[in-house]
Amino acid sequence: MRLVLASNNAKKLKELGTLLAPAGVELVTQGSLGIAEAEEPHHTFIENALAKARHAAAASGLPAIADDSGLCVDALGGQPGVQSAHYATLDPADIDGLAREALRERQDAANNRRLLSALDGQANRRARFVCTLVAIRSADDPEPLVALGRWEGELLTGLRGSGGFGYDPLLSIPALDATVAQLDAETKNRHSHRALAAEQMVALMRSAWHLA
């Protein structure tokens, strides 16, 4: 079954393509079909993921899948949540002309600084990465498949590890005795919030859509 991935992220395409392969699905990015990215105006992961999936399905005429992910911190009432990617505001003068990768690195660093500042002196460091996956057969599908993965951890007071991106150097996973940034790709993909959500989605596709 061919599905449009409501993202233009090549790494996400590769990762989800591998994780969802047991369901017999083939993913293509919306960008490869000339589809622009959808707006994400909502306050919850599920609403944003559903909006993105519907947008991709309506524009392509194909089934679609979307994810919305982020970091939720208990002491901050679940924030940064859906604003995780843009938690900190960058000065336009500091990012003018930056290449996409350099811009992401600048944003990641600013996000981490703001998070550490917000948690300064806070004893409760519990947090989790959350991934919500939504798959639909058509834009008006009344029965979207919804899968949710949570990866529990604790936020450190400083960065540790050089791998990954975003908040990976700050979130320590006690069960693995390492931050996400210290894990190799195989371990991360086996335990991550996205892997957990994808495992659920494969089961849902098999039972509800009778795939693979």
UniProtKB/Swiss-Prot annotation:
Q: Which residues form the active site?
A: D68
Top class in the EC scheme: hydrolase
CDD domains attached to this UniProt entry: HAM1
GO biological process assignments: nucleotide metabolic process; purine nucleoside triphosphate catabolic process
Q: What is its EC number?
A: 3.6.1.66
What keywords are assigned to this protein?
Hydrolase, Magnesium, Metal-binding, Nucleotide metabolism, Nucleotide-binding
Q: Which residues bind substrate?
A: S7, N8, N9, A10, K11, K12, S69, F165, G166, Y167, D168, K188, H193, R194
Record's InterPro entries? Answer: dITP/XTP_pyrophosphatase (IPR020922), ITPase-like_fam (IPR029001), RdgB/HAM1 (IPR002637)
Name the Pfam families on file. Answer: Ham1p_like
Its recorded reaction(s) are: XTP + H2O = XMP + diphosphate + H(+); dITP + H2O = dIMP + diphosphate + H(+); ITP + H2O = IMP + diphosphate + H(+)
Identify the cofactor(s). Answer: Mg(2+)
On subunit structure and binding partners, the annotation says: Homodimer.
Identify this protein by name: dITP/XTP pyrophosphatase
